[in-house]
Amino acid sequence: MANLKAVFLICILAFIAFHCVVGAPTAEDSIVVKRSIGTAVKKAVPIAKKVGKVAIPIAKAVLSVVGQLVG
């Protein structure tokens, strides 16, 4: 279950970081772009942790219900 939690948090982190980078102004200078990505990831980590704490119990409940329906 720890691997599932890690994958889930990575997906949330990537989604939030992507939206932060897309929403941020772009620049042709690669250093500025790297800093923007770094800042987006730093901002996304705490948000991903909060979302993960709420979403993982919901996902577990849904998986158990689906497992009962299928099995």
From Swiss-Prot:
Homomer of four to six subunits. Thermostable. Still active at 100 degrees Celsius. Keywords: Antibiotic, Antimicrobial, Cleavage on pair of basic residues, Cytolysis, Hemolysis, Immunity, Innate immunity, Secreted, Signal. Its main location: secreted. It comes from the Eukaryota. This is Ceratotoxin-D. It is found in: Secreted. Residues 1-23 form the signal peptide. It comes from Ceratitis capitata (Mediterranean fruit fly). GO terms for biological process: defense response to bacterium; innate immune response; killing of cells of another organism. Residues 24-35 form a propeptide. GO terms for cellular component: extracellular region. The gene is CTXD.
